[in-house]
């Protein structure tokens, strides 16, 4: 059975989640960013950050996060959905939407009226109700499209 689960509800998966996020998103220089952030997210009383896993009978097949900022210039906007990923072997079945929906629901319950994300993908997020609202700039000199979804 495929499920989108919140890591806060399954802290026993912490090490596996960190390894998955690192393998999927991190460079050698950023390995500890995921380790430190995910570990501390399990014990904070703050609303954010939150991390999610997509599992198929216990095997991790995808991930996402809900964070205060995704290393982008628009720090006036939050929360941000980040690190959305579904294994290639499981794509084409709207499984990414399950992760988006889980993060959106948590943001709504926390009192947020919108969520944001930055990406270079055009067409995917629009399919799930996201609207392109502008461009943001990253500290490493690149830019990304910014999307918003009203909750």
Question: Can you describe what each PLM-predicted range is?
Answer:
Residues 1-17:
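A short beta-loop-alpha structural element at the N-terminal edge
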Residues 26-53:
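Active-site rim helix/loop that mediates acceptor-substrate recognition in acyltransferases
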Residues 86, 92-105, 117:
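Conserved acetyl-CoA-binding loop-helix of GNAT-fold acetyltransferases
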Residues 55-57, 149-150:
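Active-site beta-strand termini and strand-to-loop segments that position acidic
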Residues 109, 113, 119-143:
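Conserved active-site alpha-helix within GNAT-family acetyltransferase domains
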């Amino acid at each position: 059975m495929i499920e989108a689960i919140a890591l806060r509800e399954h802290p026993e998966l912490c090490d596996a989640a960190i390894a998955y996020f690192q393998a999927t998103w991190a460079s050698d220089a950023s390995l500890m960013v995921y380790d430190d952030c995910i570990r501390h997210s399990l014990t904070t009383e703050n609303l954010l950050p939150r991390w999610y896993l997509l599992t198929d009978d216990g095997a991790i097949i995808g991930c996402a996060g809900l964070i205060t900022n995704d290393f982008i210039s628009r720090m006036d906007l939050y929360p941000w959905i980040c690190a959305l990923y579904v294994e290639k072997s499981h794509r084409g079945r709207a499984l990414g939407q399950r992760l988006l929906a889980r993060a959106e629901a948590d943001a709504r319950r926390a009192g947020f009226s919108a969520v944001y994300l930055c990406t270079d993908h055009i067409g995917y997020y629009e399919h799930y109700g996201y609207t392109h609202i502008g461009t943001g700039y990253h500290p490493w000199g690149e830019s990304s499209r910014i999307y918003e979804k009203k909750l």
